[in-house]
Amino acid sequence: MIPIKHLFHISSPQEEVFDALVNTSKLSAWYTSKVEGGNTQGDQLTFSFGEMKFIAEIEELIQGTKLVWKGLQADVPVEGHRFIFELDRNGDKTRVRFTHEGYDEQDDSYANMNYSWGKYLESLRQFCQKGKGEAFGSPAYRI
């Protein structure tokens, strides 16, 4: 398997960054404006990107430090993929390690997803640091 990995820092408390990952109203500010579902382990989340939907299960949740989504159903080939967010402190910043597991090759789908995750993770950083993200479907979203 060939994972997508991103490592970056956010100048916000770790608890606030984690809350932005699990609170659906905050997810809708940085990821996609249409998010439905729960926020505890075993719950499902439905993310809408225009006509495209992505349904994930919260496979693992360790409060404040780790969140894992497992892709259940999607209009892109990510069923069974795992999306892992790991947080810790690094000085006065929150370090975020993101991993998307599930690709067998670095094809166009992999490249597109890698680019998209970079964009959304920067939106997460902007939301946590400045209070405004660039979620898909929001006025701030850049195509």
Predicted features and spans:
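Hydrophobic ligand-binding cavity/cleft-lining segments
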Residues: 1-36
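Hydrophobic-ligand binding "helix-grip"
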Residues: 36, 48-92, 97-104
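Alpha-helical scaffold segments that form or flank carboxylate-/histidine-based iron centers
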Residues: 13, 46-50, 112
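Short coil-to-beta transition motif at edge beta-strands of beta-rich domains
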Residues: 39-45
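Hydrophobic pocket/interface hotspot
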Residues: 17-21, 27, 45, 58, ...
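A conserved amphipathic terminal alpha-helix motif
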Residues: 102-143
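A short, polar/proline- and glycine-enriched secondary-structure boundary/capping micro-motif
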Residues: 29, 78-82, 106-112
